[in-house]
């Protein structure tokens, strides 16, 4: 964490400069401190094609003289040097006591926008600026910036289909399992096949108590994958995809396979 001067603060201070000064009865020159920060509650952002989502960035900060009402700015730094910020949506800080405030800024993400490409998928780092009520009287000590406050995981949505046949099947005979993995293409606005990905064929006997991994599969052309495996008991079969730094993890719907004795 470090204190920053007005000259490096960014768009936030340009707006604050036009606002009337907040009263600072106790001229304590201690810079503000960022206590915690989160983006989307720490959850992974999973986005499909042509999807619009508004998410919240939260920063909790304190200063001896309090945090000014509009004293927060949040940016995300991501893959390929990309920067994500939302200057058009309001950011505010609400006090919870005389020194501490909860600051929020809203980010509107539209994967149908030409500004969003598939390269935006990945891990982003959260940066924040906070300003105390000393901003107008002692700007040199009223601002703090901090980077790497949180990791924001942005993933392209994934889908898995799955089919198993024959069903019912004689005990000991092979079941043919076929699936397809598709992922959101934010640039074309559709789901497309994802070749070269790893998926797990899993099984749980009836009644389901323990999931059994059966086989590791790899997707080929158009995201298709398949295998055969002997059926020994009634139960449900499905595919599980663990995801990557670009694609979200997902499961296929389960298929119950009835196994006939003899």
Locate the predicted segments by residue.
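Beta-strand-rich domain onsets/edges
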Residues: 31-49, 146-191, 256-261
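Signal that preferentially marks extracellular ectodomain short beta-strand elements
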Residues: 102-121, 227
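Extracellular acidic, Ser/Thr/Pro-rich low-complexity tracts
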Residues: 51-69, 75-81, 132, 183
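Enriched for extracellular/lumenal, surface-exposed ectodomains of secreted and cell-surface proteins
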Residues: 118-140, 233-253
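Secretory targeting and sorting signals
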Residues: 1-25
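Short Trp-Ser/Thr-centered turn/loop motifs at beta-strand boundaries
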Residues: 142-155, 219, 226-229, 246-257, ...
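Short flexible loop/turn segments that cap and initiate beta-strands
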Residues: 66-79, 185-213
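Glycine-centered loop-to-beta-strand initiation motif
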Residues: 99-105, 210-229, 235
């Amino acid at each position: 964490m470090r204190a920053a001067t007005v000259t490096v603060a960014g768009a936030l201070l340009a707006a604050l400069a036009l606002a009337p000064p907040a009263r600072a009865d106790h001229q304590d020159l201690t810079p503000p401190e960022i206590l915690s920060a989160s983006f989307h509650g720490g959850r992974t952002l999973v986005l499909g094609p042509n999807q619009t989502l508004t998410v919240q960035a939260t920063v909790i900060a304190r200063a001896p003289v309090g945090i000014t009402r509009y004293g927060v700015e949040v940016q995300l730094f991501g893959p390929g040097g990309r920067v994500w910020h939302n200057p058009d949506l309001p950011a505010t800080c609400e006090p919870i006591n005389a020194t501490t405030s909860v600051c929020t800024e809203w980010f509107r993400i539209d994967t149908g926008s030409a500004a969003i490409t598939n390269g935006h998928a990945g891990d982003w780092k959260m940066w924040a600026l906070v300003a105390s009520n000393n901003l107008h009287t002692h700007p040199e000590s009223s601002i703090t910036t901090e980077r790497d406050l949180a990791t924001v995981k942005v993933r392209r949505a994934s889908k898995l289909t799955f089919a198993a046949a024959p069903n019912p099947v004689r005990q000991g005979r092979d079941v043919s399992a076929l699936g397809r993995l598709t992922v959101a293409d934010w640039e074309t606005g559709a789901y497309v096949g994802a070749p070269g990905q790893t998926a797990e064929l899993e099984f749980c006997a009836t009644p389901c108590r323990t999931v059994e991994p059966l086989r590791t599969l790899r997707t080929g052309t158009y995201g298709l994958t398949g295998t055969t495996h002997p059926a020994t008991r009634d139960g449900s079969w499905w595919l599980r995809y663990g995801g990557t730094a670009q694609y979200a993890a997902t499961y296929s719907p389960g298929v119950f396979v009835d196994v006939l004795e003899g």
